[in-house]
Curated annotation (Swiss-Prot):
Assembly description: Part of the accessory SecA2/SecY2 protein translocation apparatus required to export cell wall protein GspB. Binds the Ser-rich domains (SSR1 and SSR2) of non-glycosylated GspB, binds much less to glycosylated protein.
Pfam families on file: Asp2 (PF16929)
GO process annotations (BP): protein transport
Function of the molecule: Part of the accessory SecA2/SecY2 system specifically required to export GspB, a serine-rich repeat cell wall protein encoded upstream in the same operon.
Family according to the record: Belongs to the accessory Sec system protein Asp2 family.
InterPro entries: AB_hydrolase_fold, Asp2
Domain of life of the native organism: Bacteria
Species this protein is from: Streptococcus gordonii
Protein known as: Accessory Sec system protein Asp2
Phenotype on disruption: Loss of export of cell wall protein GspB, the protein accumulates intracellularly in protoplasts.
Keyword Transport included in the entry's annotation: yes
């Protein structure tokens, strides 16, 4: 088998002598502290650039890894949760490479999971409310709220019965199991459960397995881990009466407890089942911390990893995949406070101050960077293709920008509950009310804007009008084109701003 996973184990007992190693793994075992050079030599002889996973069952042997430190990828070191690092060099090493504490007692199950979780890349997508089919037997009120949700109100019956199904099946591979998450809100007077049918691969109707998941099961992401490949047919069942709002159905390749989308990836959830994804990469553990907010994207997961890693410093990727491709990082007080807390916690992890913080984004990401940048006093905020007036964007979509960004109306309704002029102004003011309370007197702003901007034509002028009278340092550059034009040049300017600030403010030279 080509491209096998390279697994390094350091400990007192060679696991490969006691358990069956999965076929897609090459196993390398070392024990003696005198073999530090041997690990490096084996990597050179077998042309191993890095190990897919490093399993350590004795933390005293961690110094064995110091010689290959430059070859270690964060989040790939796994050690027993029963052990605590006592020596400072070892504790810092584990922190520096984001080592994961796990249960090593069930070795066969751990290796089985790792064999499926250590794949390259990432994958996730969603089925929107537009992909739902309401059961013909339901006689209550039905309201389609665009990409936001499907709203049902009425009597669902005293027994569970199918209420909604999805038009498309999901592929569940035995090599890469999926995990699922359903957005919904409901009255307490009704109850839900999810029924999933595993349809035999190559068949149209042969059932291999049928599973039912209660609301309690759905409080966490459901991992569908089968040792066979099948297609998943999904039905939502309900009983009781009241109002039910069903949002997107998310499915992603699982990494079990080792991360979301990528090793170390995490998801912030609020009580409304809304999600924000985030991923921290430690870089060289030296200032600054760059927080990058993803742009609007239908594919789920993280963007910008390559760009940010090239800077060398620690960074935090934050992405929003609600509705069709994001709702600009706004949400409940609980969700927004969660985003602020995530940024603060990672500054504390690194021992950085607000003056060692940069927030940045492109397009939709500029909203998150400025909105949450207002909660700190960052060294810099970098915005390319800035968007600020979300209500105005939705209003323009009716006549001036039809079929270009129709989801803006769903975003307007999601955040204000309406689509009238008052709602437009309310959403616009939500940004500026917070922005104008912030102290940016010590913050550098880097702006790259489109001269023929068609989404939010006044965003750049509005930002400059506010920032000009303050003591803010401002760098800006205009590019010819509309909002979605010349992305290559915009990204070049985006990265140039980062490099200028890293060199001038932090003494980092590429």
């Amino acid at each position: 088998m080509k491209n096998k996973l390279k697994i390094l184990q350091i400990g007192s007992i060679d696991w490969s002598k006691e358990v069956v190693i999965p076929d897609n793994m090459d196993w390398y075992y070392f024990f003696s502290l005198t073999l530090r050079l041997a690990i490096k030599k084996v990597m050179e002889m077998e042309k191993i650039n890095h190990f897919s996973a490093i399993i350590v069952d004795d933390l005293d042997l961690i110094p064995d890894l110091f010689l290959i430190e430059s070859r270690i990828i964060p989040y790939t070191i796994f050690y027993s949760k029963k052990q605590q690092a006592i020596q400072e060099p070892i504790a810092f090493f584990l922190k520096r490479y984001c080592a994961q504490q796990i249960d090593l007692s069930d070795r066969p199950n751990l290796l089985r999971k790792l064999s499926k979780a250590l794949f390259r890349g990432q994958y996730g997508d969603k089925m929107t409310p537009l992909d739902m089919v309401v059961s013909p037997g339901f006689k209550g009120r039905i309201c389609h709220n665009g990409y936001e949700n499907l709203e049902l109100e009425g009597n669902f019956g005293s027994d569970f019965r199918p209420i909604v199904s999805w038009k498309y099946n999901i592929v569940a591979s035995k090599k890469n199991p999926v995990e699922i998450w359903l957005e919904y809100e409901k009255d307490l007077s009704c109850e839900l459960r999810l029924r999933i049918y595993n349809i035999q691969e190559g068949s149209a109707a042969d059932l291999v397995r049928e599973s039912v998941f209660s609301e309690t099961d759905m409080e966490e992401t459901i991992v569908l881990d089968n040792d066979f490949t099948s297609f998943l047919g999904i039905t939502l069942e309900a009983r009781g009466f009241g109002t039910l709002k069903i949002g997107a159905f998310h499915q992603r390749l699982t990494r079990y407890q080792f991360g979301k989308f990528v090793l170390g990836g995490k998801i912030l959830k609020d009580s409304h089942r809304q999600e924000i994804n985030y991923f921290f990469y430690p870089g060289d553990f030296k200032p600054p911390l760059v927080v990058y907010f993803s742009g609007y994207r239908r594919a789920e997961g993280f963007e910008g990893f390559g760009m940010m890693r090239g800077l060398g410093c620690p960074f935090l990727l934050i992405s929003d995949q609600r509705l069709d491709g994001g709702v600009f990082y706004l949400g409940s007080d609980e969700l927004e406070e969660g985003i602020r807390r995530i940024i603060q916690e990672h500054m504390e992890l690194l021992g950085f101050s607000e003056r060692e913080l940069i927030l940045s984004g492109i397009s939709m990401g500029t909203y998150g960077a400025a909105y949450y940048g207002a909660d700190f006093s960052p060294r810099a905020i970098i915005l390319c293709k800035p968007l600020a007036n979300l209500g105005t964007i939705a209003q323009r979509g009716r006549l001036r920008l039809p079929e270009v960004f129709p989801m803006a109306l769903d975003i307007l309704h999601r955040h204000t509950g309406g689509k009238d002029r008052e709602n437009v102004m309310e959403l616009d003011n939500r940004y500026w009310k917070k922005f104008k309370k912030a102290d940016f007197s010590r913050t550098i702003f880097g702006l790259a804007y489109m001269k023929e901007e068609d989404y939010d034509p006044t965003a750049y002028e509005d930002l400059v009008q506010y920032l000009y009278p303050t003591e803010t340092q401002l760098m800006s550059n205009g590019l010819s084109g509309r909002h979605n034009d010349d992305s290559t040049m915009v990204i070049n300017w985006f990265m140039n701003y980062h490099r200028i600030i890293l060199e001038k403010e932090f003494g980092r030279k590429k």
